[in-house]
Amino acid sequence: MERDDQPTQIRYATALATWADAGGYDAEILWDACCVSALGVPYESCRWRQVVTLSGGEQKRLVLEALLRGPDEVLLLDEPDNYLDVAGKQWLEQRLRETSKTVLLVSHDRELLNQAAERIVTVESRHVWIHSGRFERYAQARRDRNERLAELRRRWDEEHTRLKQLVVDLRQKAAANDGMASRYRAAVTRLGKFEEAGPPEMAPRDRNINMRLRGGRTGRRAIICEDLELTGLMRPFDTEIWYGERVAVVGSNGPGKSHFLRLLMSVADDLPRGAIPAEPVAHSGLARLGARVSPGLFAQTHARPDLAGRTPCEIVMTEHARLRTEAMNALARYELAFCGEQPFETLSGGQQARLQILLLELGGATLLLLDEPTDNLDVASAEALQQGLETYQGTVVAVTHDRWFARSFDRFLVFGADASVYESPDPVWDATQVGRPRPQRCDSGDSSTARSP
């Protein structure tokens, strides 16, 4: 204090007491713990920092720390995993499992739901139902429930038909025999009460997203990289990717992975129908595509200036359909027909993502380069994409942080935090983890290597 007189000391003591009564000291302890956990520094070191200068992941984790450590016993979390990297999601899963609070969360991250949710509440067809189990059993539980609902509705319809026919029969008999009038009135009353109670809940309609990714036969070696270096991003590495393989590109956040996909797109000699050439990517060494490899790129940011101002129907008709009905039928398979006349930029993120996948299908790409394809897809669309890739006759290289999606891949090309590129038998999500190169395989020409000096 600049002044040490008695009135000043009294005011200072009063202010401290007021701060304590308001819970200020407890708040300081809480926020110190939050800042250390989320930002790696104590509250005193960052107390004046503008929140807008934090990354999206830092902001989200700081808020989640405050909520999970705070006094509230019930938390409502809307997409709490957005902006979190995989390490952040794993931290969130652990905290959700450990907390004694009641948590209601909305999420499309299937791995998060599987690891953290004890019950799954589904809202569909204006009804709500609860699955008391892990997400990995959710799909079967939903099928079983829908089968029960369909059977109940079938029985109700049969009984409804029987009661209506009984009323008709008794009406005819009552017209000829007064003694049947009481039975007729009883049947009418019974039918009325049955209809007043109403039918059981209808089984909800399944999402009808049908991705017919076909591809085509190419040379055995689909991608060849020799001493390839992404200038200023990653150290030189070698790798070969063979026809039909599913390779996930994983690793630390930051530049490198998306550049790798754009580089593969830029060196193509043959592009699918409707695809636009990619801008050159600075690199040294060799990056080459095999015979008859025609790559299609799914852009993570959905940045497609060539589609701006055009409707999905117009886009499909330009390159892939001569008739409007053909275009709308294709859009309907991706549940896009209802927005077929909206400009591309007004579509939701999920709609733009599904349209991009449809264009890859119609273009006939034999190599799919997918940059975070499930980021904006709901659960049904993400599962439809995985089903489409299972039957796809071509090669797939995908950058992803979706752990559930990554389970379906054969190989993992890891872009490490130390600028190395190497193969791993399992996905590596920790940005600080350094892995060892995978030993070269020598079996029947189907070998695949990735090296980083």
Located regions from the model:
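ABC ATP-binding cassette signature C-motif
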Residues: 1-149, 211, 217-453
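A short, surface-exposed helix-loop junction/capping segment
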Residues: 7-18, 164-174, 206
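ABC ATPase nucleotide-binding domains
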Residues: 149-170, 174-189, 433-453
